[in-house]
Curated annotation (Swiss-Prot):
Protein source organism: Mus musculus (Mouse)
Subcellular compartments: Secreted; Cytoplasm
Family to which this protein belongs: Belongs to the TGF-beta family.
Gene: Gdf3
Calcium listed as a keyword: no
Anything else known: In contrast to other members of this family, cannot be disulfide-linked due to an atypical cysteine knot configuration, where the fourth cysteine is missing. This fourth cysteine is involved in an inter-molecular bridge to stabilize the active form of homodimeric or heterodimeric signaling molecules.
Protein name: Growth/differentiation factor 3
Tissue: Primarily in adult bone marrow, spleen, thymus and adipose tissue.
Induction details: Markedly increased in an obese-mouse model lacking adipocyte fatty acid-binding protein FABP4.
Length: 366
C-alpha cells in the first residue's frame, strides 16, 4: 500500500470513528510509513537545534508555495540526505569530585546509541556539537583546551576509568561558553564497515591558565559552570537512494476544463490529517498536520480529454466501450508531492525525515 493510500484510509477512519477511538490504531500498519514499529512515547521533548527547525520551516514554506525542492539534499548543511537524526549523549562524568587536577577541568565519556541508523543507509554527515553553556556578557576566562579521543575499552559502565585510544581533536577555546562542532564522519568509518551499535568518545576539558585569568574576578568557577551546562549531541545525516527517485511517468497535457464542469467527475478533494486526532502530537514536533487530499469522481469516456488522463486511460475507456467486461478508467493521483516530518522516537532521538508521495496535488483518470 502506497503512503498516500494509507493516509487516505486513515483520514476516512478519523471521519467515521467516534471521537477518542483512534488510539487503538496507533500500533497498526499506519505507522509503518514512518519506519516505526509502534508509536513512540517520550516523556518530554528533547531540545531541537536551530538548524533542524530552520530546515523544517523552509520545507514547509516551499511546499505551501508550490516551489520545487530536492528533499534528498540538505541545503542548510550542504550534504545529500533524506534522514537527519539527532542522537543525545547518554554518557557520564569522570572524577567530578576532584576538578583541576593537572589542569583538568572535567572528563566525560560521551556515549551515542547508533542502533537507530538503518543498515542500508549511506552516511553523508556526522557532526558532534558540544554546548559549553549560554554566552555571557562577561569576558569569561580562562582559556580552555578541549581534547576528544576514541574510547578503546569503556570498562565497567559508569564506575571505572575507560581506556583512552586515538586522539581525534585538540582545540583551544577562548572561554567556557558557546558551541563547538566536530566532524566525526571519519571516526564513524568503523560503523559503516562493521555496523557498530554505539560510539564511545572520551572528552577532557583542561584549563589553560595565564596571568590574566589568575587576577581577573570571575562570576563563577568555570569548571562548575561546565559541569552544570555541558551538553553534547551527534547529528547524523544518511541517504537512502531508493527514496529519491523522481517520477518518470509522463502524462497527456491537461486541457482546460469547460464551464459547467460536473463535480461528480474526477477531481481532487481536500483531506487534512491532524496529528492531534491520532495522538501523534505527543511525539511529532512539526508539522501539526498536513493536507493529504484524495482523488474521487467518475471518468466517463466523453470527458477523458478534460480529466488529466493518461494515454492508457484513454485506451482503456475505448476498450470498455467495446467490451463492458474491461474495467472503466478510475480516478487516481497524477501528481504527488513529499513532506518532511520532525519527531522524537522512544530512544530520545530527534529525527527529521523526508517522505515521498504523501500529498495529492493533482488527479486524473488512469
Amino acid at each position: 500500500m502506497q503512503p498516500y493510500q494509507r493516509l487516505l484510509a486513515l483520514g476516512f477512519l478519523l471521519l467515521t470513528l467516534p471521537w477518542g477511538q483512534t488510539s487503538e490504531f496507533q500500533d497498526s500498519d499506519l505507522l509503518q510509513f514512518l519506519g516505526l514499529e509502534k508509536a513512540p512515547s517520550p516523556h518530554r521533548f528533547q531540545p531541537v537545534p536551530r538548524v533542524l527547525r530552520k530546515i523544517i520551516r523552509a520545507r514547509e514554506a516551499a511546499a505551501a508555495s508550490g516551489a520545487s525542492q530536492d528533499l534528498c539534499y540538505v541545503k542548510e548543511l550542504g550534504v545529500r540526505g533524506n534522514l537527519l537524526q539527532l542522537l543525545p549523549d547518554q554518557g557520564f562524568f569522570l572524577n567530578t569530585q576532584k576538578p583541576f587536577q593537572d589542569g583538568s577541568c572535567l572528563q566525560k565519556v560521551l556515549y551515542f546509541n547508533l542502533s537507530a541508523i538503518k543498515e542500508k543507509a549511506k552516511l553523508t554527515m556526522a557532526q558532534l556539537t558540544l554546548d559549553l553553556g549560554p554566552r555571557s556578557y562577561y569576558n569569561l576566562r580562562p582559556e580552555l583546551v578541549v581534547a576528544l579521543s576514541v574510547v578503546q575499552d569503556r570498562g565497567v559502565w559508569g564506575r571505572s576509568h575507560p581506556k583512552v585510544g586515538r586522539l581525534l581533536f585538540l582545540r583551544s577555546v577562548p572561554g567556557p561558553q558557546g558551541q563547538l562542532q566536530f566532524n566525526l564522519q571519519g571516526a564513524l568509518k568503523d560503523w559503516s564497515s562493521n555496523r557498530l551499535k554505539n560510539l564511545d568518545l572520551h572528552l577532557e576539558i583542561l584549563v589553560k591558565e595565564d596571568r590574566y585569568s589568575r587576577v581577573t574576578v570571575q562570576p563563577e568557577n568555570p569548571c562548575d559552570r561546565l559541569l552544570r551546562s555541558l551538553h553534547a549531541s551527534l547529528l547524523v545525516v544518511t541517504l537512502n537512494p531508493k527514496h529519491c527517485h523522481p517520477s518518470s511517468r509522463k502524462r497527456r497535457a491537461a486541457i482546460s476544463v469547460p464551464k459547467g464542469f460536473c463535480r461528480n467527475f474526477c477531481h481532487r478533494h481536500q483531506l487534512f490529517i491532524n496529528f492531534q486526532d491520532l495522538g501523534w502530537h505527543k511525539w511529532v514536533i512539526a508539522p501539526k498536520g498536513f493536507m493529504a487530499n484524495y482523488c474521487h469522481g467518475e471518468c466517463p469516456f466523453s470527458m477523458t480529454t478534460y480529466l488529466n488522463s493518461s494515454n492508457y486511460a484513454f485506451m482503456q475507456a475505448l476498450m470498455h466501450m467495446a467490451d463492458p467486461k474491461v474495467p472503466k478508467a478510475v480516478c487516481v493521483p497524477t501528481k504527488l508531492s513529499p513532506i518532511s516530518m520532525l519527531y522524537q522516537d522512544s530512544d530520545k532521538n530527534v529525527i527529521l525525515r523526508h517522505y515521498e508521495d504523501m500529498v495529492v496535488d493533482e488527479c486524473g483518470c488512469g
